Structure formats: structure tokens, C-alpha cells
Amino acid sequence: MNPPAYTSTSGSVASTGNCAICMSAISGLGKTLPCLHDFCFVCIQTWTSTSAQCPLCRTVVSSILHNITSDANYEEYEVIFDDEGYNEDAPLQIPEEPGVNVSPQPPVHSTANSASNTALMRSHAQPRVLAPDNSSVFQPSTSSHASFSSGFAPYSQTPPVGASNLEATRVSRSAVITPTTSTGPRLHLSPSSRSVSQRLQTLFGITKLPGVPTEPPAYAQAEAHFGQANGYGQHRGALHGSYPAVLTAQDTSQIPTRLPFRATDRDVMEVLNSHVICSLCWVGWDEQLATLFPPPIVEPTKTLILNYIAIYGVEDVKLKVSLRCLLHDLTVPFVENMLFLIDRCTDPTRISMQAWTWHDTPIRLLSGPIKSPDGGSTSQDTSVSNIHRSPPGGSSTQPSSGRRPGRPKGVKRRLFVDDDTGVSTNESVFPVINAPIHHKNSKLAALPTGSTTDSNERLVVESPGASAEQPSTSGSSPSPSRRRGRKQGIARIEMLTKKVRRK
């Protein structure tokens, strides 16, 4: 089995594969111990802030290797949890290795803002031996992590850029740094007057180190050997033990039903074609979301993630920031967050109608032009928009459901003047019926004499006295015979209306 290829860029070793969390090329390599899976360091560091398990194999992650420049020069980010069953007073048990002097240090409690990130990194002068020695590979013991369990982190994480509104939700969490056993310097990060970029640079270890080796490091060989010893291969291009083979978008029918969703849209298929997905990548999505959110909002979370992907695209930086804000904050309002992002989507072509399925149930994503908060649309085509807003300073002219513009709701009262007496009388007049009247053929015989139906099924009532008369010109008063015919026609219409209403 060939190990994955690695290249050296910007002073540190980088992997040529894709990150399983953000589904994009790995930027800033971070490897999890003991399973040795590759991720973006920012992505896996954010992931481990709420869960101690590897997102691929569900192994308890003890630390993350990053800033790897050689076999003997790298930095390690420790994943520390203060969950149930974990003794905070007891130091973390790390297997003793030859040539490493253990010097325990007292715990240090943060005196800065309680919303600080308590990530703990250490630079190894004498790191762990991961190269094969006498046909054996050092495998860190997992007995020290038996008390670890996935759940919420007791400490807060520095929110990503653009997520300052989530800072208030993290104030109630306390920052505690536990002792570590290392001969290298200890680095404690706390918020201060430094800028956000400086804190991120210190937190994520973005440094330029010279002397980068050109050959793959020894831990790549250890990764291949470790995978074979545990019954599964590497993440990309191999099987994961008893799980199904590596699946691509062309073979989505073989994906188990326990997966959170299955993509069926053509655009999504093209995205998945560039990233080979194995079934183990999706194992535990339900369990992971269940540990992050209450059960009633697990399904809305999945739908919201799909909308994020539809709006921003898989390779957009905003998608990563949005997913971090969504998956690592317990009080995020899903609907408001989604509408906030949609209202600020200036490119309506990025949003297309996509169909997703979850347990064979279709989920329709957002589509069409987006209504901005001020009432204007981001696209010229507003036919698919269902948002109706009242004009400022006036009532809305949008008709209600089931009514036509200008159509009265009931019988309209019309004023007629009797030319003989000069007294105005109120007569109930039913408005002109423009819509087709659906009636049974058996009822046609019940129509009054002189009433017919035209080609559009419009009811036409002709009065006997006025049938032979020509229509009067505009401005002339109607004759008495026409007035009598009009009243008779009105009476017949009212009678038909009452019969229809009774039925």
C-alpha cells in the first residue's frame, strides 16, 4: 500500500489530498494522533473543540501534529477535555519514551478574559519516535484516553473572523490549562490587545520555517503500517475494514441509508466527483450532530448545511466560516442565520434549484432571486418570488388568496334612482361574474327563461321586455320598460345566487 503523497510548501509539509471536513484541498496540514488522518489544521482544531473523536474513524484524538517541517521538528496541539469521568487534578498519562525526560509542571489558570481560547501547543525538542524501528512501529497507547467521551468542550474557542456576534455566548465558559509533560517551551494563548490576525497566527502556528525536506516524512510510513495493523487502509484510495468500498458520486445508490443525506443534483455530483468519498467518512454524522444539538434541531441543521453549500459553494471561504459558526455554537438561531446569509447573497446565479434526499425524502433547497431587506430584488425576474411587501405609506395592493383584483368579497350595494318618483332606492346587485361557472347539466333546465350561457360559460340574463330594445346611448335616461326589465333580471340573478349558496 503506497502512502499518500506530500509536498513541501511555505516552510511546512503539506498533503496533496482533500480535507474531509471542508471538502477542499488541505491548507495547513494537521494530523490526528493516534489515527494519523490528514485535515486542515484549522478544521480539525475547530472540530476537536467540541468532540474528542476523529471525524473519519471515531477514534479518540489525543493531539494534532502541525507545522511539520521534518521528522524531528513539528508542533503538537493537545486536545484536552474536562468531561465526565476525567480527573482534572490527575496529570495526563502519556507513554514514557526512551530519551524523553518527564518534568511535570503545576497547572496554570488563565487570568484573562474567560472567553479566551485555551489551545495548548508545544514544540518538541525530542519528539515521539514514529519511524519504523526493527520492523515495529510505535503506536501510542489509547488506555490513557479511556475516560474521554465526546461532548461539549468546557472551554471556549476563539471565534473565527466574522463571527463576533457569537462572542457573548461563550462568556460563561471557563478556561483551564492542565499540566503537560514536555521538555519544550509551553505556550499559553490568551486574548490581549493583539489583533485578531496576530492571535490566529500564534494559535494556528502560521510561521515560515527554512530547511524543509524534500522527501516524505517518516510518519507517512507509520500511517500506512498503522492502518494495516488495525484492519483498514488510508482514508483516500483504500478500504476501511468491513465498511463498503470507496464510493463516488456515480454510485450513490450503494451509500447506506444511515448517511445524513445523498446528493442527486448534477452540480453536486460534479463536486463530489473531485472528492472521493468512502462510507466511513459519513459514519457518525447523526451521532455527532446529536452530541452538538438537541434532537428537534438535528434535521434542520442538516438542511441548513445544505443551504450553506448551495449559497456559497464548496470551495468558498465563507462556507467554512459559516459551518464553524453553525456546528460549534449551541445558541445559533438557524432560521435567522439562514435568512441573514440569503439576504446578503448578491449573486442570484449561485443559487439553483437542487434536490437532496434524506431517507428517500426529497429536500428542496432555496432557489430563485433573493429579496433584499429594502424590498428590492437582486434579479430582474421576480416571478418566482413569493415575498409581498406593502408599499411605504399606503396599504398593500396585493390581492388576498382566492380573490381577483377589484373583485368585491360579497354582494355589492349599488344605488339606483327611480326616474318616476325621484327617490333613490338601494338594490342588491351581484357583481358581474367573470370566472367560469361550473354547474351540472341537470341544473341547466332550472335557469330562467331568456338566460343563456356563452362559450366561456358566463351567465347572461336577458330580460323579456328589453330583448327587443336597442341599448340606450350614453347619457340618456333608461325608459320605464328597460327599468322594469333590469329589475326583473336582478331578481332572477339574486334567486340563482341564493340557490348556489345553499348548495
From Swiss-Prot:
Basic residues: bias regions: 404-414
Enzyme class: transferase
Biased composition annotated in UniProt, kind: Low complexity: 389-403, 471-480
Any single GO BP term: protein polyubiquitination
GO molecular function, one term: ubiquitin protein ligase activity
Positions of the UniProt region annotated as Disordered: 175-194, 367-418, 445-503
SUPFAM superfamilies reported for this sequence: RING/U-box (SSF57850)
UniProt entry tagged with the keyword Transcription: yes
Entry EC number(s): 2.3.2.27
Zinc finger region(s), RING-type: 19-58
Catalytic activity field: S-ubiquitinyl-[E2 ubiquitin-conjugating enzyme]-L-cysteine + [acceptor protein]-L-lysine = [E2 ubiquitin-conjugating enzyme]-L-cysteine + N(6)-ubiquitinyl-[acceptor protein]-L-lysine
Keywords, in A-Z order: Host-virus interaction, Metal-binding, Modulation of host ubiquitin pathway by viral E3 ligase, Modulation of host ubiquitin pathway by virus, Repressor, Transcription, Transcription regulation, Transferase, Ubl conjugation pathway, Zinc, Zinc-finger
Feature: compositional bias, Polar residues: 375-388
Pfam families: zf-C3HC4
Assembly information from the UniProt record: Interacts with host BTRC; this interaction seems to inactivate SCF-mediated protein degradation in general.
Function summary: RING-finger E3 ubiquitin ligase that degrades host SP100, one of the major components of ND10 nuclear bodies, thereby disrupting the organization of these bodies. Also plays a role in the inhibition of host NF-kappa-B pathway by blocking the SCF(BTRC)-mediated addition of ubiquitin chains to host IkappaBalpha/NFKBIA, thereby interfering with its degradation.
The protein's name: E3 ubiquitin-protein ligase IE61
Organism field: Cercopithecine herpesvirus 9 (strain DHV) (CeHV-9)
Lineage, uppermost ranks: Viruses, Duplodnaviria, Heunggongvirae, Peploviricota, Herviviricetes
